[in-house]
Amino acid sequence: EGTQVPANGMYVVTPKGVVMFDTPWDTTQFQPLLDSISLKHHKTVVMCIATHWHSDKTAGLEYYKHRGIKTYTTILTDELSKKNDKKRAEFLMAKDTVFNFGQYSFETYYPGEGHTSDNIVVWFENEKILYGGCLIKGVDETDLGYLGDANKKEYASTLKRVQRKCRNPKFIIIAHNDWKNIHSLKHSLMLAKKLKRNNN
């Protein structure tokens, strides 16, 4: 959780509506985000998937649920959200799940413990887009950020599983700061290997 820093999310516009990944953590941004999406695309948000239990991903789940948006997390994320008094989703995923929505197909993937014990990524196989959330850091980062709930010894192995699953991504969207460099996953793995060495 740590210090507040700018956070990225992602949404996908389809003929059936907009799918959003993660919520803002600033309560004043919950409705303005919906309004700006509606104004720009003339579509409503119909689904939101949060990628782990920290507030920068889950804070808006309850608000969006009351707005009629289908909200999703994994069962593990829900357990941790409940334990830590965070907002919870309406629908729970028991395993990696493929969603076919409009013309898009994407998969939620749990690669193992890293930033948190429940962090998932979202992989668009056809478009080669990886939404890495807080598990992946930008190339300008010198460390892996907040590690208060991290598995320091498993982080590198988890990132290797992401590499094997999500091959040759064209875009990697990360949770914080600039996401435009395609080498963020490789850079994060280097940082995670260093972290593991320092914690052996």
Regions found by a protein language model. Name each.
Residues 15-17, 28-72, 167-170:
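Active-site metal-binding motif and surrounding structural segment of the metallo-beta-lactamase
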Residues 2-5, 23-30, 53-57, 148-152, ...:
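Solvent-exposed, acidic/flexible segments
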Residues 17, 25-26, 75-113, 116, 118-183:
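Metallo-beta-lactamase
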Residues 1-16:
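Zn-dependent metallo-beta-lactamase
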Residues 11, 19-21, 46-50, 70-74, ...:
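Structural recognition of the beta-strand scaffold that forms the well-ordered cores
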